[in-house]
Amino acid sequence: MALAPTDMLCFALHSTAHAVHAAYAPLLQPLGLTYPQYLVLTSLATTDGQTVGQLGGGLRLESNTLTPLLKRMESAGWLRRSRDGKDERQVRLALTDDGRALAKKAESVPRAFAEKTGLPMSDLADLRDILAALRDRLKPAKA
C-alpha cells in the first residue's frame, strides 16, 4: 500500500524546509539579505578568511551556486575576494567593515526565528542535531 505524502519523512522535510525559508524571509528582508547571503555572511563572521572551497564545503554549496552569490555580495560591499598569497589558485574571502556591521545586525535573527517556532531551545537544538546526522549519513561533507 502506498503512503500518503503526509505520512512520508521526505514530505515532512521538504515542506518544513519551505516553511523555514518563508519564516526567515521577513527576518532577513529588513537587512537586505537573502537566505543564502545570510548563510555566507554568518559563516564568514564566524570564520573570516575562508577559501571559496572551504566556504562551499561548509555550506554544502557548489561553486556554480556560490560564485555569483559572492560576486553580488562583493558588489554590495559586504565582502572582499582576493587571491591567496601562498597559492594563487585559491580565492580567500573576508568581510569588509560594512559586512561585519551587517553580520552584527544579523545576530538577532536566530533568536527571532527560534521565537517564531514556539518550541523550546532544547528541542530546537535536538532537532538540529538529528537533522545534521541524517544529512551526514545521506550525503557526507566533501573533504
Where are these regions (language model features)?
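N-terminal leader segment of winged-helix/HTH proteins
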Residues: 1-31, 124-129, 133-141
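Compositionally biased, low-complexity segments enriched in small residues
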Residues: 2, 60-63, 113
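N-terminal helix-turn-helix DNA-binding core of bacterial DNA-binding proteins
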Residues: 11, 18, 22-65
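Charged, amphipathic alpha-helical coiled-coil/dimerization segments
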Residues: 49, 71-132
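DNA-binding alpha-helical recognition surfaces that contact promoter or target DNA
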Residues: 68
